[in-house]
């Protein structure tokens, strides 16, 4: 399959998923709370792509949720290109993806994160994953979440779940705190074996996130919470901020490739405490 077609298929999927997720989130919130939509361009003078980020705040269910789509292209800086595969002969790149972060009003509902992307240099690969960060311990929820992820992974390859769970546990870890960010999930990168199969898996991950996040909200949002619970949530969000600013690859990639700063930092919660 031609790389142009692969790019178009991947980009269209990410954009469609953004539309679907935002529509469902607004339906949950009701008529009063809507996404604020911002379009952006990577360059003011050259055609280097851009994207659209959507942020909804102060809802009855969501304190803040961001859903970002991007398609950017151009050249890596000499400093950054050495960190990216496929750039020995050329610094040109193309990248598209979707990123979602949900910070909930009810402290019993965990923060949820998902992203998938397709990056092309001299060759193309997929990356992404999803994870959940509760501020209240709930072993039943944790077991259910991982069983759902395993089911999704097993549809494509029986080895995926164990491997991608391990990568997620290793990735979402704060070494300076010596603690994990949350209860894990799956995380994968440099996926470039069979394009059709890889793209099918990437779509599966997106659909799974939609279904899992809906189910978690349905289960947990009914629970009553206190001011003390909210304070616990604020402190847990502090850990979220630390990880995203110090260790997150997506944040570093976006900032070092001229991405939109507001879109990149949309993952940060509206309020956090230390």
Regions found by a protein language model. Give the residues of each.
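Long, contiguous binding/interaction regions
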Residues: 104, 251-274
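Internal mixed beta-strand/loop scaffold within catalytic domains of large alpha/beta enzymes
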Residues: 51-128
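Short helix/loop capping segments that flank catalytic or ligand/cofactor-binding pockets
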Residues: 78-80, 109-111, 138-141, 253-255
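Gly/Pro-rich turn-and-neighbor structural signature
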Residues: 2-85, 191-246
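Long, charged, mostly alpha-helical binding arms that flank functional sites
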Residues: 151-201, 216-218
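Compact, glycine/acidic-enriched structural inserts
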Residues: 122-166
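A generic structural motif
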Residues: 6, 104-106, 122, 132-139, ...
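Glycine-rich, often proline-containing surface loops adjacent to acidic residues and nearby aromatics
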Residues: 64, 94-96, 125-133, 179-193, ...
């Amino acid at each position: 399959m031609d790389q142009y077609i692969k790019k178009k298929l991947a980009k269209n999927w990410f954009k469609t998923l953004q539309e679907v997720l935002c529509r469902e989130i607004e339906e949950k919130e009701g008529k009063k709370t809507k996404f604020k939509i911002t379009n952006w361009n990577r360059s003011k003078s050259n055609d280097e792509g851009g994207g659209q980020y959507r942020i909804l705040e102060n809802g009855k269910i969501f304190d803040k949720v961001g859903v970002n789509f991007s398609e950017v292209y151009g050249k890596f800086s000499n400093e950054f290109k050495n960190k990216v595969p496929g750039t020995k002969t050329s610094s040109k790149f193309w990248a598209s993806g979707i990123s979602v972060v949900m910070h909930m009003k009810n402290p019993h509902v965990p923060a949820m994160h998902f992203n998938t992307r397709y990056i092309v240099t001299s060759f193309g690969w997929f990356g992404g994953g999803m994870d959940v960060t509760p501020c209240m311990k709930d072993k039943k929820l944790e077991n259910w979440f991982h069983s759902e992820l395993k089911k999704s992974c097993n549809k494509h390859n029986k080895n995926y779940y164990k491997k991608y769970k391990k990568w997620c546990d290793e990735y979402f870890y704060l070494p300076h705190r010596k603690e994990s960010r949350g209860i894990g999930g799956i995380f994968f990168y440099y996926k470039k074996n069979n394009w059709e199969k890889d793209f099918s898996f990437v779509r599966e991950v997106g659909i799974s996130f939609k279904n899992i996040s809906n189910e978690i909200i349905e289960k947990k949002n009914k629970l009553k919470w206190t001011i003390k619970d909210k304070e616990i949530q604020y402190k847990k969000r502090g850990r979220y901020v630390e990880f995203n600013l110090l260790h997150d690859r997506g944040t570093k990639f976006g900032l070092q490739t001229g991405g939109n700063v507001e879109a990149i930092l949309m993952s940060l919660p509206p309020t956090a405490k230390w």
